[in-house]
Swiss-Prot record:
Cell location: Cytoplasm, Nucleoid
CDD domains: MraZ_C, MraZ_N
GO cellular component: cytoplasm; nucleoid
The keyword Cytoplasm belongs to this UniProt entry's keyword annotation: yes
Family: Belongs to the MraZ family.
Annotated gene: mraZ
GO biological process: negative regulation of DNA-templated transcription initiation
Main location: cytoplasm
Name assigned to this protein: Transcriptional regulator MraZ
GO molecular function, one term: transcription cis-regulatory region binding
Entries under InterPro entries matching the protein: MraZ, MraZ_C, MraZ_dom, MraZ_N, MraZ_sf, SpoVT-AbrB_dom, SpoVT-AbrB_sf
Length: 142
């Protein structure tokens, strides 16, 4: 399970050093793809395969599933982190998420998310008030 917030920097070659506490779970390989709210999702390869299986189970006649699959898979980049725990974020994904040098990497249970630091701070500011309101709908009785 991925938890926590980390603030690494992107190097000049577009590489990110994965947080140390995530490296063991990601050492076997990752898939980086477009996420919601203009962040990037980083999945361990087995988790990405699980999602791929779920999408494959959708009928080809399901228009929304086809559309989502196209974007999700077309933008995906698979890689094995190097010995220093680095992964390269391809240019098209850096552009999609508007990544600058300063990043925020968060644990989001089954995946890791990569955000531009300014975008993350803006997202938090906008969603903070909603957090308490949506809690009851997501986790009733918590």
């Amino acid at each position: 399970m991925f938890l926590g917030t980390h603030t690494p920097r992107l190097d000049d070659k577009g590489r990110l050093i994965l947080p140390a506490k995530f490296r063991d779970e990601l050492a076997g390989g990752v898939v980086i793809t477009k996420g919601q709210e203009r962040c990037l999702y980083v999945f361990p390869t087995p988790e990405f395969q699980h999602i791929a299986d779920q999408l494959r189970a959708q009928p080809m006649t399901h228009k929304a599933a086809r559309a989502y699959s196209r974007v999700f898979f077309a933008s995906a980049h698979d890689e094995v982190p190097d010995k220093q725990g680095r992964v390269t974020i391809p240019g098209h994904l850096r552009e999609y998420a508007a990544l600058d040098r300063d990043l925020v990497v968060i644990g989001a249970h089954t995946r890791v998310e990569i955000w531009d630091r300014v975008a993350w701070e803006s997202y938090l500011a906008e969603s903070e008030d909603e957090f308490a309101d949506i809690e009851e709908g997501v986790l009733p009785g918590l």
